[in-house]
Amino acid sequence: MDGAAVGLRVLLGLGLVSLLTLEAMPAAWGLATTGRPRAREKRQAVDTTPDGVLVKSLKVNCKVTSRFAHYIITSQVVNRQPNEAREVAFDVEIPKTAFISDFAITADGNTFIGDIKDKASAWKQYRKAISGENAGLVRTSGRNMEQFTIHITVGAQSKATFQLTYEEVLKRRLTQYDIVIKVKPKQLVQHFEIDVDIFEPQGISKLDAQASFLSKELAAQTIKESFSGKKGHVLFRPTVSQQQQPCPTCSTSWLNGDFKVTYDVNRDKLCDLLVANNYFAHFFAPKNLTNMSKNLVFVIDISGSMEGQKVKQTKEALLKILGDVKPGDSFDLVLFGSRVQSWKGSLVPATQANLQAAQDFVRRFSLAGATNLNGGLLRGIEILNKAQGSHPELSSPASILIMLTDGEPTEGETDRSQILKNVRNAIRGRFPLYNLGFGHDLDFNFLEVMSMENSGWAQRIYEDHDATQQLQGFYNQVANPLLTDVELQYPQDSVLSLTQHRHKQYYDGSEIVVAGRIADHKLSTFKADVRARGERQEFKATCLVDEEEMKKLLRERGHMLENHVERLWAYLTIQELLAKRMKMEGEERANLSSQALKMSLDYQFVTPLTSMTIRGLTDEDGLEPTIDKTPEDSQPLVKVGPRRTFVLSATQPSPTARSSVVSKLPNQVTGVDTDPHFIIYVPQKEDSLCFNINEEPGVILSLVQDPDTGFSVNGQLIGSKPSRPGQHEATYFGRLGISNPPSDFQLEVTPRNITLNPSSGGPVFSWRDQATPQKDGVLVTINKKRNLVVSVEDGATFEIVLHRTWKGSAAHQDFLGFYVLDSSRMSARTRGLLGQFFCPLDFEVSDIRPGSDPMKLDATMRVKNRQLAVTRGLQRDYSKDPRHGTEVSCWFIHNNGAGLIDGVHTDYIVPDIF
């Protein structure tokens, strides 16, 4: 993992390109999202809508709770052209260490939502992308960033909204946490806002916000920052006129640079232990410790490939670093090309005379030969081992080995596996090894594995004008060791799934974070012990936290994520599993990959093992865009294949076979819920139809039946006692059965349990579980106490919503709702109360008139060569919000859907759930 990739960093842009030109040339960049209108904003004398496209708003919202950052970026663009479509490009750049968890594009009521699945399935589904044609998102990689770009068309007089969510654990570096947002809109944005909200139980000790592109006067006017106790807040909301300064007549924005928020927390108490919902997070960064003296060896590549700027910048950095080595430290330098040479051959004290002599040696050395990396490292290790063996354990300084190379081993031992073994056997866990890889022409994965195997990390040094500063920045992170052999201990019988809790060294200005899962039995208190070695003494500490007091503390969190401690644990665990798999092979690597994949799917993270596809959004070849994590070794700003433009439903013709819109806003849902109300969205009409089915409890109804594949969904009704005599007994779905015979898959779902293949004694899951069981191309994603999603490979995707009843609710039993997310690959012969509507449906509504209920309209509908009396009404869609739901306006067909459904409703009664 790249040690320099810390904090949060994001770059956004909306590029506006005219569809009328043969060559797509960007006319402007913009940022947009939902924001508040400005009161008394003066009318601008300039055009803020180049090409007729208005970047209406942008909101960057970051909520941090105990280092866990939840980031939502929402942007909106409006095409004001009366008759012409426009192409819009959405660019987002996020840290490589962050995980995307959600992405959606909305246009004219149609929402296209990201669907996270394992990468193998995603690429199997989109084979054309593998053959070199990019499936829509440009996957690029900067220094510590990943960039995604998607081009879509927005119809005349239409708008598009983008929303991206990602999460990360902030890393403390050089005494502070950083949130950096790089903005570059160029075009004026009507409503621009960056809102950062921080909650830290220890209390916030400092908070600062700066923008590189602001004068002091403008910063004072536009940046509002405050902190008190546990809460901190930063708001940046420039008006359009402020965006134009210092050029009031310009149509471009001066917003161009870094917006940076930095903060730290109080360290008055040794313990920062957070417990919530059977998960804990422990943040360890004690203050007032004495700096340890250190033994430091630099191993420097002087092979011929280092010529030019590389060796010049390396020498500059070494000279400055040697100037910062403290009295009491000891050091040496090892150089390797074809031969290996050391400055002294053993450690010498950091006296002024020795430091000056070392600087002279650095100025004079020249490049020579090939790359004997193995020999150079073993010489450096030998020097440190010899020095360490001469000290009693308690008085031993902290030993650090740092290697800088720009190439691959070409002299001496060149087999990478053998080099890893040699280094591992020589160090034997005594001290950390940090590898710095200069440039891109090297095997960075090799350096990374070597560092991880030896308690350190690897960092890439980019060939740029600031390479000297990059090298110095790395050294500053490890310059002041405070503790060695740090171990954080927890009750063995109470803690499960612990993240890394042993660290070779702890450095000033950093922080050790450990998270874990607490066993189900209730604990009134939770304890952590810390053992380490400091400067000439042992370090011991005990932390104790009362869970009830912790609950009171967490209730103070106005915007706290309900499960943020659990997601923090999941984030750290996945990162560690991915790091461990790098140095494993065969079955061990496969097991680690399987664990990381399962957790990535459980928590809906885009990781190196998963991909996010955007359902329903397609280009001219029918490809859907995908979001992937880029590999570390990928070159920055490299585009794969030609640019593709994806078309939103607002500009698509009516489909002839299936609606291309798969995931929709609440008024565009197909499903059945409550007692039971069927809702059918008809994309050709951009309207919905609805009907009820009145049957007795115990009756099983066919919802989906595909005769070509045998796939089926059936639902059994349960009853609810009427609230007063003579009232009809309401019924709900209390049991659902999904069957896919080609894969021998069955799933039985009730409000109590979820059973996979019940006829053969398959596993049983509770709604309290977060799980992703999979069988032969069918993936079930159980989202704890909320819903589950069934995805059939090359088939369909369905959602089952859990409804828990409460006192006073209409239903007296828990029940289920069923929704269709993707039916595009079901056959044209699919039947069932829902399945028959997967094919295109046409209808006409006429004679709209006031109904017997003055709040509703009646009308006449022509559908399937029948004329029906219908009523305009409201139903509720619970697919996005199971507790409250969202209103759906629809034409209601009376008498159990008579005239709309094929046959009569009793034709859909079946004898069994499968």
Swiss-Prot record:
Major localization class: secreted
Modified residues (Phosphothreonine): T405, T410
GO molecular function per UniProt: serine-type endopeptidase inhibitor activity
Listed SMART domains: VIT, VWA
Residues bearing carbohydrate: C62, N288, N291, N591, T656
Domain VIT: 39-168
Maturation-removed propeptide residues: 31-36, 676-914
Residue ranges of every copy of the VWFA domain listed in the record: 293-453
Functional summary from the UniProt entry: May act as a carrier of hyaluronan in serum or as a binding protein between hyaluronan and other matrix protein, including those on cell surfaces in tissues to regulate the localization, synthesis and degradation of hyaluronan which are essential to cells undergoing biological processes.
Family stated for the protein in its record: Belongs to the ITIH family.
The protein's name in its UniProt record: Inter-alpha-trypsin inhibitor heavy chain H1
Organism in which the protein naturally occurs: Mesocricetus auratus
